[in-house]
């Protein structure tokens, strides 16, 4: 395990500022997800941690020691790429063994025709084989060791890529959109396998994704990025329940949170309903209120039956436009009567 610290990381490509003064702390054995839209800088930040890119300014520390100017091989981190990056002409066993072989060879012996005959590789074959066997057992891919990547499914190739990173016994595990090439069903399966791998290995994981579901379900901590900045860092439920701003509130949660206008007045007035609220810190001007789709209870909607709302709940008139049947629940689209130009989404459980 290892603690990772990023201090004031900045990075630009030409005139484009990609990372804007990023500081982040990842504790020993923690699983943190860097999440955000494409182009927010999360993959660049991961590559800087790995040593594949250099920051313009700032410092990277692993276990309290600066690795900012160290080569990737000197950082003892392992990275899993989106495209797996497996050697197509090698078996699974050979793919898994390559990091162990290369780590034992001097630079001049790393040419393809020399690596398997170099003394270090021959001498350590039993150790290398034991490492491959251990990882294959851990990831349940022992029956695939003689196959080549072209003979594997997408999920199997992903497990081999994980194994090739894990076999090095790294301090930190870096993953860049590892599930993006898998279909929806397989993503759920491999997602749970990665979570299990984190729990059993105890390693520090830094995981890049644009998928908030992956980030929320797998992580101890989520770092939400936007245009090169960290908007909020915290436990998944902290970002969901206490978003730092509207951008965080809109990104976290599915369907997206409803944002409507409100009048501070006395307490808080939403349409014709007065809501209890503490607004001492609210300044004069426009006020927005966020309402999660799953926090709205639907009643008296023709053709639909729902559980009763809690007593004394505020009631707002709603105009239904579309209902999507998702099996155990419904996604209802429409508008509140007091603000008909703002689309509203309601996620409602069916009344069984």
Question: Where are the regions that the model predicts?
Answer:
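The feature captures the beta-strand-to-loop junction immediately N-terminal to the Walker
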Residues: 35-37
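Non-catalytic connector elements of ABC transporters
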Residues: 267-352
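Helix-to-loop junction immediately C-terminal to a conserved catalytic motif
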Residues: 50
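Conserved ABC transporter NBD signature motif
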Residues: 58-66
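ABC ATPase nucleotide-binding domains
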Residues: 86, 91-247
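Conserved coupling/switch loops of ABC nucleotide-binding domains, chiefly the family-specific signature
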Residues: 56-59, 227
């Amino acid at each position: 395990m290892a603690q990772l610290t990023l201090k004031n990381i900045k990075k630009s490509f030409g005139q484009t500022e990609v990372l804007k003064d990023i500081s982040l702390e990842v504790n020993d054995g923690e699983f943190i997800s860097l999440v955000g839209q494409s182009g927010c800088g999360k993959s660049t930040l991961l590559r800087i941690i790995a040593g594949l890119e250099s920051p313009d300014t700032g410092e990277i520390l692993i276990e309290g020691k600066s690795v900012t100017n160290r080569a990737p091989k000197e950082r003892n981190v392992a990275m899993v790429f989106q495209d797996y990056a497996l050697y197509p002409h090698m078996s699974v066993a050979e793919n898994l063994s390559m990091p162990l072989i290369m780590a034992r060879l001097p630079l001049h012996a790393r040419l393809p025709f020399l690596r398997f005959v170099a003394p270090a590789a021959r001498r350590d074959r039993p150790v290398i084989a034991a490492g491959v066997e251990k990882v294959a057992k851990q990831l349940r891919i022992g029956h695939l060791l003689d196959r080549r990547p072209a003979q594997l499914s997408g999920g199997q190739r992903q497990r081999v890529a994980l194994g090739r990173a894990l076999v090095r016994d790294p301090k930190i595990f870096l993953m860049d959109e590892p599930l993006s090439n898998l279909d929806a069903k397989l993503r759920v399966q491999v997602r749970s396998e990665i979570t299990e791998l984190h729990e059993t290995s105890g390693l520090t994981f830094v995981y890049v994704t644009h998928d908030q579901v992956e980030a929320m379900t797998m992580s101890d901590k989520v770092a939400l990025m936007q245009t090169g900045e960290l908007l909020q860092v915290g436990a998944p439920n902290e970002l969901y329940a206490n978003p730092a701003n509207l951008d965080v509130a809109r990104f976290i949660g599915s369907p997206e949170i409803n944002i409507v206008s409100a009048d501070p007045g006395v307490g808080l007035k939403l349409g014709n309903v007065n809501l209890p609220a503490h607004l001492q810190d609210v300044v004069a001007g426009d006020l927005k209120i966020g309402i999660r789709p799953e926090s709205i209870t639907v009643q008296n909607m023709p053709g639909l039956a729902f559980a009763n709302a809690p007593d004394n709940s505020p009631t707002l008139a709603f105009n239904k436009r579309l209902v999507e049947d998702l099996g155990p629940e419904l996604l209802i689209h429409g508008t509140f009567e007091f603000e008909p130009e703002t689309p509203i989404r309601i996620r409602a459980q069916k009344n069984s």
